[in-house]
Amino acid sequence: MSFLDLAKRRYATKNYDPTKKISVEQIEELKQILTLSPSSINSQPWKFTFVTDPETKSKLAAQSYMNENSINKVNLLVVFHVMEDIEHFEKRNLSILPEAWVSGFYEPLVKANGRANVKAWMQSQVYLSLGYFLSACAHMGLDATPMEGINLKMYKEILSQDGYAPLFAVTVGYADADDWAHPGNLPKSRFALDDVIASI
């Protein structure tokens, strides 16, 4: 299947089949894929928590508003975090990069614009990994739903990943055959190519 065909097939699943579970091998493959995610200057300011423990997953589901039902039906929830401490990020992540990348890009174009800009830039890197992850899921024949509608404060408390703040989560599983959001039932709604693509 071509990547274009995968893109046409992929959608934010709303109703999962609770009888179909992701295998341990698939979960391990997804872990490896996420470690290979791209980021600006290879900064990697992230952590990914793979939640398969039913009790923990249930606690997180209760803090996920309209996404609670989806989380309870799948056996994998992945939480994407960003590093909180800028100084720790610079010491741990940037110190191992080529000096030219740091002095030629990070310091004059990111850090020079203030701490809020650094924080926003770090979060942007985590979102890059999300697109990569969703594409990988589609390639593996898995259905996934990215979710920003979660209680970030409670997610942080439940997961206890010191030094990292949760940004969003993704359910991964298999869609129910009758999922109302499936493109076969609800055609994809996207702007026309000419509205979003410029060719110069």
Language-model-detected regions and their locations in the chain:
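N-terminal targeting/leader regions
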Residues: M1-K20, Q26, I33
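Short secondary-structure junction motifs
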Residues: S43-W46, L142, L167
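Glycine-rich phosphate/pyrophosphate-binding beta-alpha loops
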Residues: P38-N42
